[in-house]
From Swiss-Prot:
GO terms for cellular component: cytoplasm. It is found in: Cytoplasm. L-aspartate binds at residues 176, 222, 450, 491. Belongs to the class-II aminoacyl-tRNA synthetase family. Type 1 subfamily. The keyword rRNA-binding does not apply. The record marks 84 as: Important for tRNA non-discrimination. This is Aspartate--tRNA(Asp/Asn) ligase. It comes from Bacillus cytotoxicus (strain DSM 22905 / CIP 110041 / 391-98 / NVH 391-98). One of its GO terms (biological process) is aspartyl-tRNA aminoacylation.
Length: 589
């Protein structure tokens, strides 16, 4: 078999007159009365191949048997297309290849999906036949971008003197965070490894080990409820460094992302990135990962609501809640009563009891709650919300957390429905000054807002014992277009502070030592101050590639139920395997 001389998408006018050897798949076959045209595709693109009796009767006879997705080896001569046949939409549109010889390397059945960017297949079919789905150019280009992003990050970190170090996949189960994926040990009866949710502890131990600058393109595993931007196994760019301040870490990450955007997308972004405290983000956007590509911020009307004539508003404030609103500028005519009812049902999903609304007309406020406000109160609403004729005002009165969640989600929905979001924008943002702990009323205990190894502000360390809810974290999240791209923090590196943190989380001394004794002991041997960040590679590529589903950036992803339609994983295993592992199943019928 002759070697390939050209990739299909790279045969250009410079090759006119040359004999070329091409290999690829049949994208399309057209029979035009004695002539057969085949679009031959490989990873680089498509080239048109012409079979004619004048050039080769033998090749034409073979071409008559060829169908879509056959794998071919074509030998032929590159010629210029006629003036009327030039296709400006193809990189190879000025030439075609006159086939002198063709070999079928492999035949193909009719594929269950159309191999094209615009396929008609459902996602389940695409995942079942993922190897065919990956042939679509849009998929190849996505994974080429993923490769380019990873390569750019590796090169950047190499220039910053970081070492790429692999950490264990089989590790110890720890109780914090999501559920672990467990792996039974055959050698140690009744004991289990866990797949890592992140390399957090090992990268900190590398800092104890004096490596100073570490990174890893790390595989992580979390047994949690899935959604469109979550997968049970995912990849993160894991970074840790000793002796760097928070400012130095943020600056380095900004330089890294600037290089990624320029090298991969050809987009210049400005630095430093805007910063917003966690409290400010929640107050203004109802989200700890605000999408700042459009306005429509939340406005607090609680002070006004406390003394107004609408009892729903006053009652919410009296019960310790708040009243907030968003102004959908110019949207009054775009939302009917039925449409607003749909918005009401939408906010109920986030815990809101309802959605109050007003439309602004030339002669004042109109809507079911307008009658509860006198002229002065109506003017306060108009002024506070900067409202004018044609605006739609939407209110939620409830607990603070419900108001933030429901209006934050409603803001995003309206931004999409009203086409306020510039899809070509890349708005990076740091969210800083997070609460260290979050209280779970059902569990009746505190949980770490990020993880148990996050350093509190120095002046807040004592609050761990007196008022844990007031302690602030030296933590920072990188947000891009409303998605959390990554989270990081300075880490605890002193044993006494770490023990105070464990105590605030409800660990007894014995539990802390049993779970994390190796880390606590390591902190007694000269641990340097350190910190880092972990960036979600899958999510970053999703955003840069303009995809809406994380599964499109993972070669062989799982479904929303954490199953693989291609391999039928997870699946039962033989009884002998379970016996070797000393396991008995207690499966509910």
């Amino acid at each position: 078999m002759a070697e390939r001389t050209h990739a299909c998408g790279r045969v250009t006018v410079e090759a006119i007159g040359q004999t070329v050897q091409l290999k690829g798949w049949v994208q399309k076959r057209r029979d035009l009365g004695g002539l057969i045209f085949i679009d031959l595709r490989d990873r680089t693109g498509i080239v048109q191949v012409v079979f004619s009796p004048e050039t080769s009767k033998e090749a034409l006879e073979v071409a008559e048997t060829i169908r879509g997705e056959y794998v071919l080896h074509v030998e032929g001569t590159v010629v210029a297309r006629g003036a009327g046949a030039i296709n400006e939409n193809m990189a190879t549109g000025q030439i075609e290849v006159q086939a002198t010889k063709v070999t079928v390397l492999n035949a193909a059945k009719t594929t269950p999906i159309i191999i094209a960017d615009d396929t008609d297949a459902s996602e389940d079919v695409r995942l079942k036949y993922r190897y065919l789905d990956l042939r679509r150019p849009v998929m190849y280009n996505t994974f080429k971008m993923r490769h380019d992003v990873t390569k750019t990050i590796r090169n950047f970190l190499d220039t910053e003197e970081f070492l790429e170090v692999e950490t264990p996949i089989l590790t110890k189960s720890t109780p914090e965070g999501a559920r672990d994926y467990l792996v039974p040990s055959r050698v140690h009866d009744g004991e289990f490894y866990a797949l890592p949710q992140s390399p957090q502890l090992f990268k900190q131990l590398l800092m104890v080990g004096g490596f100073e600058r570490y990174y890893q393109v790390a595989r992580c595993f979390r047994d949690e409820d899935l959604r469109a931007d979550r997968q049970p196994e995912f990849t993160q760019i894991d970074i840790e460094a000793s002796f760097l301040t928070q400012e130095e870490i943020l600056d380095m990450m900004e330089r890294m992302m600037t290089k990624v955007m320029k090298d991969v997308k050809g987009v210049e972004i400005s630095v430093p990135f805007p910063r917003m405290t966690y409290a400010d983000a929640m107050a203004r956007y109802g989200s700890d990962k605000p999408d700042t590509r459009f306005e429509m911020e939340l406005t607090d009307l609680s002070e006004f609501a406390a003394g107004c004539g609408f009892k729903v508003f006053t009652g919410a404030v009296e019960n310790g809640g708040q009243v907030k609103a968003i102004n959908a500028k110019g949207a009054a005519s775009k939302y009917s009563r039925k449409d607003i009812d749909a918005l009401t049902e939408f906010v109920k999903v986030y815990g809101a009891k309802g959605l109050a609304w007003l439309k602004v007309e030339e002669d004042g406020l109109k809507g079911p709650i307008a009658k509860f406000f006198n002229e002065e109160e109506a003017n306060v609403i108009m002024t506070t919300l900067e409202a004018s004729a044609g605006d739609l005002l939407l209110f939620v009165a409830d607990k603070k957390s419900v108001v933030a969640d429901s209006l934050g989600a409603l803001r995003l929905r309206l931004g999409k429905e009203l086409e306020l979001i510039d899809e070509n924008k890349f708005n990076f943002l740091w969210v800083t000054d997070w609460p260290l702990l979050e209280y779970d009323e059902e569990a009746n205990r505190y949980f770490a807002a990020h993880h148990p190894f996050t350093m509190p502000f120095r002046e807040d360390v004592e609050l761990l014992e007196t008022a844990p809810e007031k302690a602030r974290a030296q933590a920072y999240d990188l947000v891009l277009n409303g998605y959390e791209l990554g989270g990081g923090s300075l880490r605890i590196y002193e044993r006494d502070v770490q023990e105070k943190m464990f105590k605030a989380l409800g660990f007894t001394q014995e539990e802390a030592r049993e779970q994390f004794g190796f880390l606590l002991e390591a902190f007694e041997y000269g641990t340097p101050p350190h910190g880092g960040i972990a960036l979600g590679l899958d999510r970053l590529v999703m955003l840069l590639a303009g995809r809406t589903n994380l599964r499109d950036t993972i070669a062989f992803p799982k479904t929303a139920s954490a199953s693989c339609l291609l391999t039928d994983a997870p699946s039962p295993v033989a009884g002998a395997q379970l016996e070797e592992l000393h396991l008995k199943l207690n499966v509910k019928e």
